[in-house]
Amino acid sequence: MHLYISSYYTCLGNLAELMTDWEHAIGFYECALRHNPYSINALSCIATLCSGREQFGKAIEYFKRILAIQEKNGEIWSPLGHCYLMMDNLQDAYHAYQQALYHLPNPKNPKLWYGIGILYDRYGSIEHAEEAFSAVMKMDPHFEKISEIYFRLGIIYKQQQKYDMSLQCFRYILHNPPPPLTEIDIWFQIGHVYEQQKEYEKAKDAYERVLADNSDHAKVLQQLGWLYHQPNTTFSNQSQAINFLTRSLKADGGDAQSWYLLGRCYMAEQNYNRAYEAYQQAVYRDARNPSFWCSIGVLYYQINQYRDALDAYSRAIRLNPYISEVWYDLGTLYESCSNQTQDALDAYQRASELDPSNPHIRQRLELLCKTQGSSR
């Protein structure tokens, strides 16, 4: 009798779901479970419903109750992994997906591999994430999350410097972006890819499309400011760069990167006081960024405050000893000081080890070696 009543309430729950009456559906499933706590059907229905409503903690409880009855149910391990993933519990998500792959009779399930792709992406293992997402596209080209997969692959390809493939992904979803993203968000990504390719004209055009829709888009204003700062473009203009960065800071005054880029623009104009003020604002907001301290060192070097320059370079190196630019600038500083040629050589040598293909470092190192050799 209890089994019959449980089945009856489960059917009522199914009907309520069809009518999108989620609260009553959950109530009916709970009634079903009171009459039969081991009903796989009712447990699965309520777990799936909770997961769809982003009540992942509840969903996990119900999925685990099923697995206590059917430990080898791969169809349950897969959505359990998704719930753990949505709660940022990556270790348990990884375990659940492993169990799903082991127990599913056919592991070629697009939802499963979609989740695995996101898991790898969260772990920073972008090569494995790319493989998983590509597998989903082969399994089901019309998968419900296909536009999100294209977006994620676009980001991954950009990180891998596969810029043409990245652009293909972003263009594919330009007019149908995954929610909550909009067409403007995709134009921003397209602009950023073009910028990485040093296609500055195309990057500017893409960013301006974003700005036409949202004139206070802080990140786009920041990117445009940096583009106008570039010396090797047809539209290079420091005053325009400063204007864009100032507008960006009005929209988001807490962005350390915008303050830093503003300082770089003032340096290009040799306006050292303004540059110093901007750099100070940057390090106030992010004191552990080695690039900020390197640029402060360059500023001090330009105004002949060598001791302060050394302190700034030393701080940058303590934060990250693997940036060739800092070692090169340190070498330049030592070269300017009397009786520190060997220190300069050591710094240039370290810069060369970190960036062996850089011709400027190599030329400077060779010239200093010759100069030191001839002076002996």
Residue spans for each PLM region:
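Structural marker of alpha-solenoid helical repeat scaffolds
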Residues: 35, 69, 103-105, 139-142, ...
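TPR alpha-solenoid repeat register
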Residues: 8, 42, 76, 110-112, ...
